């Protein structure tokens, strides 16, 4: 039988999933995106060359790997074409390596218009979305009015459905948000111009994955964002609009849940967050600046500066529970080089003085939480690019061991730099 490995983020996204997926796909036949949209930003560095992917799975650069966009992904046709064009200009035969589910909901210009109009209307209470129409597209999906990739097979019917939904959303845009209406004809023309390209890549994803499993193929499932941004389990309402957790694999791809063999949680050696929302361990002064600059903490999708803080092991433990993690990949360990001391949050103190070791479910419950820290010695030696576990400074090894102890999960992979080669694989998920 084949092995199905899930790679997902355990924090608020930006943990370094793209690099890890790219590394592990050396042994995979398929790489599958199962949720999110082009709000993701997965950065790959291979032999010094940087590639940023937002929608196409990170396995696309591998010659013998087929990349799949599953039904749980909301797909923006213009964003997909932009990525395809950029990759093809570099000699990557995208159309030979990429497949789509016909059940992918389409993100169209009215979704983007609604996203931005709503954020503007929220003012100081804005969620901090990427403004790419992700949430409104998922809303249309759940309301059963959304258009999907499969609708493009019948262009005449697509045009009729599109007209109805444009009128529906324009009423809200113009009358409630006082924003400009979306031009139906332009939307139709733009989508139909690339419809045949999209439909040519359509496949029955669930059937493909089932047969791949029976054949013994290795499959990698690539998560986007992070566990703490999950629509159900994250810091609601400061969350994304999809299930970023392991449960999203089955619903977002059609793979039977019992076929998942290993779940790899990507955990950054410290914490970051983009946009608004709770962040108990956030740092604002010298150490926060160190993490931000040395870690190059600027969003691959939006360019926004990420908020930075100490590792929150309480939040990561929540990710362990929800995802039934098999192991961790620890990323950006090298960013901690040079710090005299390093802290790990192992609990919270409530405003009434009570100590707790779990995260609240809603954002309101995080208000007034005081992190309870353990302080460990830092290290002055460089860990950048180290590929031998035994060559790491003892203080770094102690830090790694403590993360394993407080989370109850082994660290199977350690990343010490952005390049594919700057990685230590202590236990390969496909062999676990």
Swiss-Prot record:
| Keywords on record | Cytoplasm, GTP-binding, Ligase, Magnesium, Metal-binding, Nucleotide-binding, Purine biosynthesis
Give the active-site positions.
14 (proton acceptor), 42 (proton donor)
* EC numbers, comma separated: 6.3.4.4
| Translocase listed as a keyword | no
Q: Pathway involvement?
A: Purine metabolism; AMP biosynthesis via de novo pathway; AMP from IMP: step 1/2
Q: Which SMART domains match?
A: Adenylsucc_synt
Q: Which reaction does it catalyse?
A: IMP + L-aspartate + GTP = N(6)-(1,2-dicarboxyethyl)-AMP + GDP + phosphate + 2 H(+)
Q: Name one Pfam family in it.
A: Adenylsucc_synt
Positions bound to GTP: 13-19, 41-43, 306, 332-334, 415-417
Q: Which family does it belong to?
A: Belongs to the adenylosuccinate synthetase family.
Name the chain's protein: Adenylosuccinate synthetase
Give the organism the record lists: Pectobacterium carotovorum subsp. carotovorum (strain PC1)
